[in-house]
């Protein structure tokens, strides 16, 4: 059983018991999150594709980590002019453990 969910402007294929890193969601570690933007749902035999979302299907997940990704360095310069600019960015993320995919929720 798996589902394709939309959160943070991105789409993720998830199954029960998996840990998925998504864009930052509000909440503390241990909180439960209900994701109801399910774009596709498969129970092993049948596949339901939403237009745009599948009705009565939701994904229950638990927050296992709130963190920041590895640093990405952005370096800009203009040759022969002495212009150099170095900037770093760490994108915040939320790690979710998928507890249950509920059909008919």
Swiss-Prot record:
Keyword Ribosomal protein tagged: yes
Gene Ontology cellular component annotations, sorted alphabetically: cytoplasm; ribonucleoprotein complex; ribosome
Keyword field: Ribonucleoprotein, Ribosomal protein, RNA-binding, rRNA-binding
Entry's Gene Ontology molecular function annotations: rRNA binding; structural constituent of ribosome
Family under the similarity heading: Belongs to the bacterial ribosomal protein bL21 family.
PANTHER family per UniProt: 50S RIBOSOMAL PROTEIN L21, LARGE RIBOSOMAL SUBUNIT PROTEIN BL21M
Role played: This protein binds to 23S rRNA in the presence of protein L20.
Protein name: Large ribosomal subunit protein bL21
Organism classification: Bacteria, Pseudomonadati, Thermodesulfobacteriota, Desulfobacteria, Desulfobacterales
Gene: rplU
């Amino acid at each position: 059983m798996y589902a394709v969910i939309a959160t943070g402007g991105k789409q993720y294929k998830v199954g029960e018991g998996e840990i998925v890193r998504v864009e930052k969601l509000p909440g503390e570690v241990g909180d439960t999150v209900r994701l109801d933007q399910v774009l596709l749902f498969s129970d092993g035999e049948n596949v339901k594709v939403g237009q745009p979302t599948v009705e009565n299907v939701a994904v229950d997940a638990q927050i296992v980590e709130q963190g920041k990704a590895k640093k990405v360095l952005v370096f800009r310069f203009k040759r022969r002019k002495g212009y150099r600019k170095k900037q770093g960015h760490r994108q915040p993320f939320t790690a979710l453990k998928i507890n249950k995919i509920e059909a008919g929720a």
